[in-house]
Amino acid sequence: MAGLKILFVSQEITPYLPESEMALIGRNLPQGIQEKGREIRTFMPKFGCINERRNQLHEVIRLSGMNIIIDDTDHPLIIKVASIQAARMQIYFIDNEDYFQRKYILQDDKGTFFEDNDERAIFFARGVAE
């Protein structure tokens, strides 16, 4: 199992989103896997509430630039990366202006779910797979 490569995909990872059970799992599980000597890549959506400057996100040009078609519409895929220094772990962010620039994650400020959450989830999953 020495050459095992792991892809970890999570909707929430702390410190990028508020601490919750899922965000803590998204933060600690990949770190534990990495500490066991495994190669791991971690992905999450780049929601609009994530502060790019504070978290030092930057675009990975060589991975960005392709389009993902959803419902007969092209949507540019942007991939950004940041590091959790204490864990020596990189987190890759799937971004798209149409789907992830809102300041809320899955619901608006009134608690109403966004009507395109299904498309957003499809874009995220396909972006990770690409």
Predicted regions and their residues:
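Catalytic cores of nucleotide-sugar-dependent glycosyltransferases that transfer UDP/GDP/TDP-activated
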Residues: 1-130
